Amino acid sequence: MGEIKVSPDYNWFRSTVPLKKIIVDDDDSKIWSLYDAGPRSIRCPLIFLPPVSGTADVFFQQILALTGWGYRVIALQYPVYWDHLEFCDGFRKLLDHLQLDKVHLFGASLGGFLAQKFAEYTHKSPRVHSLILCNAFSDTSIFNQTWTANSFWLMPAFMLKKIVLGNFSSGPVDPMMADAIDFMVDRLESLGQSELASRLTLNCQNSYVEPHKIRDIPVTIMDVFDQSALSTEAKEEMYKLYPNARRAHLKTGGNFPYLCRSAEVNLYVQIHLLQFHGTKYAAIDPSVVSAEELEVQKGRLGLSQEEP
């Protein structure tokens, strides 16, 4: 139990990358927690947004690998926001505080939905240069819980945790997936009642993405084809919404492929970001591009990637 938490990689990450806390709202209780790693000279970094159960450190394997290649990577943890507009306004203020005009977003599950909503929210003055959507959805009604969304704030923490755990894989899984689930359960335990209630509210509050507002943004849809909380219908809906998106398919990986299939996920992220090399929206230090590109081409041979 808890193999990831005691792994050398995780401990190295925790000891070398500081967790920063930033307040951008008038309400001092709304605190963004984030890891910001890689060259500060990069002005269009890749930002990771976690799922309901996740904290910023669930992306530690992406941070370690991608910064090793010369990328600037930021992983976030949300403050307590109760609606999508409030989240988008807070996230915009955070980007202003970090002096980042445009960013690439990697969103997992709820993080993927919020990434799309933020791109939609800023479409008149775009802040999102590209999207990587991992196990993401475009309409909260798929969870059939829009009617309970307004009552999560009343529920005790143990009940909220039970709701989240109900979406975790319960069948047989391989050891790496089991470790990923254990780690996410541990992260879930670290979240307080208001953090969980607000995330579940954002996850289930009646809302959908308006694709015409973000159709010009390059998108990669990353899907897992074994057990995950998303139905086949929800995945098909994403393909319809983004007909020109690249598709990155993982045969296995469950709800948390960034933990248990990190090498594949990292490679797909690199392939996605490759298209921006040599532009002002590159997320990588230009001096290391050629070696990194070579490595990506090698790894690409063994992956399932569909161009639109």
Swiss-Prot record:
It holds the Pfam family Abhydrolase_1. Residues 87-159 form the AB hydrolase-1 domain. It is found in: Cytoplasm. The modification Phosphoserine is found at residue 304. Keywords: Cytoplasm, Phosphoprotein. GO terms for molecular function: CD4 receptor binding. Its main location: cytoplasm. InterPro entries: AB_hydrolase_1, AB_hydrolase_fold, Maspardin. One of its GO terms (biological process) is limb development. Expressed in cell lines FT.1 and in a L cell fibroblast derivative (at protein level). One of its GO terms (cellular component) is trans-Golgi network transport vesicle. Belongs to the AB hydrolase superfamily. May play a role as a negative regulatory factor in CD4-dependent T-cell activation. Interacts with CD4. Interacts with ALDH16A1. This is Maspardin. The lineage of its organism: Eukaryota, Metazoa, Chordata, Craniata, Vertebrata.
